[in-house]
Amino acid sequence: MGKLTKNQKLAAEKIEAGKAYSLKEAAQLVKDITFSKFDASLDIDVRLGVDPRKANQMVRGVVSLPHGTGKQVRVLVLCTPDAEAAAKEAGADYVGLDEYIEKIKGGWTDIDVIITMPSIMGKIGALGRVLGPRGLMPNPKSGTVTMDVAKAVKEVKQGKIDFKVDKSGIVHTSIGKVSFTADQIRDNAKEFIATIIKLKPSSAKGTYIKSIYLSSTMSKGIKIDPKTVEEN
């Protein structure tokens, strides 16, 4: 391992080894230890006491973060011509159907979210090989297959994200930017964790929230005491 920079040393000194911080402390600390010239993303990792290999222990859901993610989300709407104007007005970056299906078949995936209608899903099924591995396949559970595409576009643009537990039992997502205030970071984290708690599978035994870590793109992970999440 190379030598630590001055900023990395300062950051390392601020985090006590093995200590679990309150969510309130962690929300401020992650700002204090991030030294970057760009507006770094903030990530949260929640390890769950579930076995994702079992269908009845899969944790998947949708959450609308109170302060958004701070990211510019590029949205493609695949819809019928009568819905195009509303989708564009709602803020979709790309709107159409057959021409975009052909582009995706050719490997184009320069987007973050695809929203479509139930009647279009038959055409999109063939794109699974391209979209599936990138997590771009529209899904009714995440609200990206809907008759009201305009409403879905607005929700995504305002900070609605979908998530699911990975094969290691961890739910990982971005909950903002380091430029957010500590209170905004805490609000977003609380909403995300509260949503995960509501989704606890009835078949999950033992401790459900095993650990929570908050970090930025440029920082070490800060361990959070799960019992402090609901504190004011």
From Swiss-Prot:
Gene Ontology MF: a single term: structural constituent of ribosome
GO BP field: regulation of translation; translation
InterPro entries noted in UniProt: Ribosom_uL1_bac-type (IPR005878), Ribosomal_uL1 (IPR002143), Ribosomal_uL1-like (IPR023674), Ribosomal_uL1/biogenesis (IPR028364), Ribosomal_uL1_3-a/b-sand (IPR016095), Ribosomal_uL1_CS (IPR023673)
Record Gene3D superfamilies: 3.30.190.20, 3.40.50.790
Annotated Gene Ontology cellular component terms: large ribosomal subunit
Keyword annotations of the record: Repressor, Ribonucleoprotein, Ribosomal protein, RNA-binding, rRNA-binding, Translation regulation, tRNA-binding
Family to which this protein belongs: Belongs to the universal ribosomal protein uL1 family.
Function of the molecule: Binds directly to 23S rRNA. The L1 stalk is quite mobile in the ribosome, and is involved in E site tRNA release. Protein L1 is also a translational repressor protein, it controls the translation of the L11 operon by binding to its mRNA.
Assembly: Part of the 50S ribosomal subunit.
PANTHER family, per the entry: 54S RIBOSOMAL PROTEIN L1, MITOCHONDRIAL (PTHR36427), LARGE RIBOSOMAL SUBUNIT PROTEIN UL1M (PTHR36427:SF3)
Record-given protein name: Large ribosomal subunit protein uL1
Organism: Phocaeicola vulgatus (strain ATCC 8482 / DSM 1447 / JCM 5826 / CCUG 4940 / NBRC 14291 / NCTC 11154) (Bacteroides vulgatus)
